[in-house]
Amino acid sequence: AGARSYFSLKNAISDLLEFDYFFPTHQGRAAENLLFSAIVKEGDILPGNSRFDTTKAHIEYRKATALDCTIDEAKDTQLEIPFKGNIDLEKLENALKSYPKEKIPAVVLTVTNNTAGGQPVSMENIRETSRLCQKFDVLLLIDSARFAENAYFIKTREKGYSDKSIREIVREMFSYADVMTMSSKKDAVVNMGGFLAMKSEALWKKCKIYCILNEGFITYGGMSGRDMEALAQGLEEGTDFDYLESRIKQVEYLGSRLDEFGIPYQRPAGGHAIFLDAKKIISRVPAEEFIAQTLAIELYLEAGIRTVEIGALLADRDPVTRQNRFPELELLRLAIPRRTYTNNHMDVVAVAVKNVFDRRNNIRRGYEIVSEEPIMRHFTVELKPL
């Protein structure tokens, strides 16, 4: 409970992100659990851009609502704009006006926007979101799993930031936030860990008991000393420009190979993955038979490539009606592990996708559910082919 690595991590978070208070946690979803246990109650509304699975599940588990205010342009996979992950500020302001402050514990801004295809959020959008939160006296929570990739896109795509370092951009991003959650297996380049950080001592005290109850004492939160030390180092390495550029260029390379074959995906290429547009690839499969999951299975059978469906299966059932929810996008995420594969591996992946694409007209049926859990079903669901 008194490992020196705790202080290494505390200093790294303070120096890079400028948050004074934090809890180590064993994963990002644990950080969400601590925070939402303290601030979210039944009937609450949490507006923001698209929430990924665990964030949305933690909100809905508490009988609250995750309100998606992502810009409409994100729904057009072939439209190329630089910041497709942005919050629609008009939608957000309308939401903040429509509900009493007591019903809105936080606005949740996810960077990058994973559900929309790994798409970044601009600094201007972060700044204006913060301005609205201050106007309506609501916390701004940044879900920060891929904050460094988001900073890279700000540097390379947004006017006025090309001469700033990644770390300078990161500090400005988080200067607008009140609280952040971090799944460190992403941009902190480690295999375990996360944290919850905030600027308010009062909020830290409110969350403290939930850390002890669910994770461990406040100076380790379910993490070993080794993991905290690695995380502190990972925050340093993960914000190195050359590292980020090599990673994101590999994602772009896979996208360029798919372009050669005419395969549609969410454009422009995201920071950590290519997201195939499953609706356009296997258009004959009915929505209720899980289009993107069908494509995931086809690609696995073709070449043993393991991907993740971001479609109706992940969208889960409506918590009130228990009917399947059918999102406008059915995406298949080809997430690329860090510091692992060469471009030759990307060539293999691209050809495998092409092979499935070439026989797309023969894929007419999908899958039905045999058994599922009442929440976050996509992790353990059992399916059978139709």
Regions found by a protein language model. Give the residues of each.
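Flexible, glycine/charged-enriched surface loops at secondary-structure junctions
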Residues: 218-225, 244-247, 262-269, 310, ...
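Active-site loop ensemble at the mouth of alpha/beta enzyme cores that anchors a bound cofactor
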Residues: 279-306, 320-327
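A structural motif shared across PLP-dependent enzymes of the aminotransferase-like
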Residues: 1-8, 317-319
